[in-house]
Structures are given as C-alpha cells and as structure tokens.
Amino acid sequence: MRSKGMQYLVVIERGPTSYGAYVPDLPGCIAAGESREEVETLIQEAIEFHIEGLRADGQPVPEPKSTSQFVHVDA
C-alpha cells in the first residue's frame, strides 16, 4: 500500500560557489549542488531516501509542520 503524499518545506540557500538545501522537518536531510535546478533535484532524492531510511529503521515519518512567510522591512 502506498502512503499519502506529503509536502515538506525546503529551504534553498545560494552560497558563493554552490546552492544548499535542507528540510527543517527532517533533521539531517540536506543537499548541495552547483545550480538551483540541481539542488532541487538532489533534495527531492534526499527526502525520499531519508524517509525510506526512517521506515527501514522502524522510525515514524515526521508530519510536515514548518511553514514560511516573507516579511517586508524598510531597509
């Protein structure tokens, strides 16, 4: 039986030479790539791999809880 789909918040950061991504609701689930497109693909794979590992270890899969919001400031 296939589980329901989940949507996790992914934070993508641009560094001096690459992009990094992490998932706040899945501690340790990270990816890095040379482009935004690459890091988006890699974090998708990392999330799937992370969840597979949790299930294989008999651990619960965390429900997505994190959200994001932009805040306007006068600068």
Per-segment meaning from a language model:
Residues 11-23:
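Short aromatic-glycine-(Arg/Gly/Cys) micro-motifs in beta-strand/loop hairpins
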Residues 24-27, 62:
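Proline-centered helix-kink/hinge sites
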Residues 27-37:
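A short, exposed loop/beta-hairpin motif centered on an aromatic-Gly-Thr core
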